[in-house]
Amino acid sequence: PAGYTAAEKAAAGGLSTVLFEKNALGGVCLNEGCVPTKTLLYSAKVYDTIKHAPKYAVSAENPAFDFPKIIARKNKVVKKLTAGIRMKMKENGVEVVGGEAEIKGRAADGTISIASGEAVYEAANLLICTGSETVIPPIPGLSETEYWTSREALLSKELPASLVIIGGGVIGMEFASFFNSMGTVSYTHLRAHETLR
């Protein structure tokens, strides 16, 4: 979340600040990474706890989950946090511009021209925080299949019967844990010899 955090600090320090964002505020972490996966994991944890309730002398017959409602809850959490960031930007006087920004050049006095849509902005300083992109491994035949990235996994409306997760990083392991708890037969394929390197 470097972009909006830096914008907030700059504005709090008295700088006139503009934040350009073509997607939802909060970046990958809030919208497609750690926050939504942790929300899904919490639902899985509650479900697992209820399934094992008799072990703790607690009666909980026929535990069940509603997958679309789990996804809806995740979306609600993300939306609430995104709205919170937007409110913080407004409170701190950060102008949020939705859309792409293009650096047009630098004047002789060092001022940087930045265009977004029809508007042009002038700035003394520029911080570029482009976030991250999903890396698609060069696996033969992968491009001919309907594979998921973490983005599609978070948007899924139906629980898959089985799933192969390529990657042993945090997000991959969180998805493996979540889908396994929900009853999906989950396999992980690691490039390295250990998970969570």
Segments and roles (model prediction):
Residues 1, 22, 168-169:
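Glycine-rich Rossmann-fold phosphate-binding loop(s) that bind the pyrophosphate
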Residues 1-18, 175-180:
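N-terminal Rossmann-like FAD-binding beta1-loop-alpha1 element of flavoenzymes
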Residues 3, 26, 134-135, 171-172, ...:
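Glycine-rich nucleotide phosphate-binding loop and flanking beta-alpha elements
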Residues 8-161, 191:
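Glycine-rich flavin
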Residues 158-187:
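Rossmann-like NAD(P)H-binding beta-loop-alpha module
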Residues 188-195:
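Conserved small/polar residues in nucleotide/adenosyl-binding loops
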